[in-house]
Amino acid sequence: MHNFYNYSPALGKTYVYENKYYKNLGTVIKQAKRQKHLEQHEIEERSLDHLDRYLVAEDPFYGPGKNQKLTLFKEIRNVKPDTMKLVVNWSGKEFLRETWTRFMEDSFPIVNDQEVMDIYLTINVRPTRPNRCYKFVAQHALRCDEGYVPHEVIRIVEPSTVENNEYRISLAKRGGGCPIRNLHSAYTTSFEHFLNSVIWDNFYKPIVYVGTTSAEEEEILLEVSLVFKIKEFAPDAPLFQGPAY
């Protein structure tokens, strides 16, 4: 006779698993990858231990060398909202012979051997009216095709914010440095040759646009300068001078 009250003990068993013996599969894979990454990172660090003897400036502008500033021009510009105005295009006002001659005479003495390590284009921007609440923005191109005529005004598209009212660009080409040591002699020989064959053969000639985040037309003061990073060598002079030597 079939018993309706038959009960299998196996149907009522409950199994309790302790979580400390089980891990999520994703966690196991992530930990394995993390451990492998740490091991590779330690190997890479050990391969660079010999570089700990050297010091490198976080910002090359403040690194070794002497900074010589050449102010090209100061101007006041009106900038309309949502637009940026061309401020540097090397059309001629950047190359006033009197300004360059005074700079060369003061910065590059004849008796010293000096080498240009880098050139920075710095643009200092300030509002002419007080209590104006907006930020300065800028864009630049290091190089362009020969014969390219840049537009005077462009729309603002993904600009860079100007920090501390100063926009600074390194103009050094790949490899950097200027191969000519006696810059004073190269300049006095020919002004045009110095610019074309010494400066622009080794450094970029950029175009720069500046604008504001203001919704109104703003009047801004621009100061455009070139900062030469100079490596200076001791002059060839005897250690002792005088009648006893």
UniProtKB/Swiss-Prot annotation:
Alphabetized UniProt keyword annotations: Viral occlusion body
InterPro entries named in the record: Polyhedrin
Family matches, as Pfam families: Polyhedrin
GO cellular component: viral occlusion body
A molecular function (GO) term: structural molecule activity
Family per similarity comment: Belongs to the polyhedrin family.
Annotated function: Major component of the virus occlusion bodies, which are large proteinaceous structures (polyhedra), that protect the virus from the outside environment for extended periods until they are ingested by insect larvae.
Protein name: Polyhedrin
Organism: Lymantria dispar multicapsid nuclear polyhedrosis virus (LdMNPV)
Origin organism lineage: Viruses, Viruses incertae sedis, Naldaviricetes, Lefavirales, Baculoviridae
Encoding gene (name): PH
